[in-house]
Amino acid sequence: MPKKEVVDAVTMKRALTRISYEIIERNKGIQDIVLVGIKTRGIYIAQRLAERLKQLEDIDVPVGELDITLYRDDVKDMEEPELHSSDVPVSIEGKEVILVDDVLYTGRTIRAAMDAVMDLGRPRKISLAVLVDRGHRELPIRADYVGKNIPTSKTEEIIVEMEERDGADRIMISKGNE
């Protein structure tokens, strides 16, 4: 399938900077925020948001990692689910947890992530930040912070590449068979 770059590194950086500003504005500061990245690329995005928030507000925002493997509604269909550990370095009790992921599609990943977060404690609020919202929701979930809205068909795929994992920052769209 041919891939087409739709967002380059500079545009991706701008989108993350905009999300950082929105987080500050909507929360009247960031003292009670915990960023929780959904494995795998959500973690890199959460770390970048924390770095940008530190530059803007001079506050270290805790960043956690969330593995949702056992919370997925398709886990029974997997032969042997690959388990990773979740690591949230602070208590989330009474905090605002911002779940961070690369792409919002059906909403099922986010539903699983909310279940996983609730097993860690009782946050005051859960919000969602995504780099890309591609539409096609199957559950009533929406992102509070969106880097880019990229409408797709159901047969297309959004591919997010991150420097930390893939060697480059970019977002591509892969055309499926329509």
UniProtKB/Swiss-Prot annotation:
InterPro entries: PRibTrfase_dom, PRTase-like, PyrR, PyrR_bifunctional. Its EC number is 2.4.2.9. Substrate binds at T40, R41, D101, D102, V103, L104, Y105, T106, G107, R108, T109, R134. It catalyses: UMP + diphosphate = 5-phospho-alpha-D-ribose 1-diphosphate + uracil. One of its GO terms (molecular function) is uracil phosphoribosyltransferase activity. Keywords: Glycosyltransferase, RNA-binding, Transcription, Transcription regulation, Transcription termination, Transferase. GO terms for biological process: DNA-templated transcription termination. Pfam families: Pribosyltran. A motif (PRPP-binding) lies at residues 97-109. Belongs to the purine/pyrimidine phosphoribosyltransferase family. PyrR subfamily. Homodimer and homohexamer; in equilibrium. Regulates transcriptional attenuation of the pyrimidine nucleotide (pyr) operon in response to exogenous pyrimidines, by binding to the anti-antiterminator region of the 5' leader on pyr mRNA. This probably favors formation of a transcription terminator hairpin, leading to a reduced expression of downstream genes. PANTHER family: BIFUNCTIONAL PROTEIN PYRR (PTHR11608:SF0). This is Bifunctional protein pyrR. The gene is pyrR.
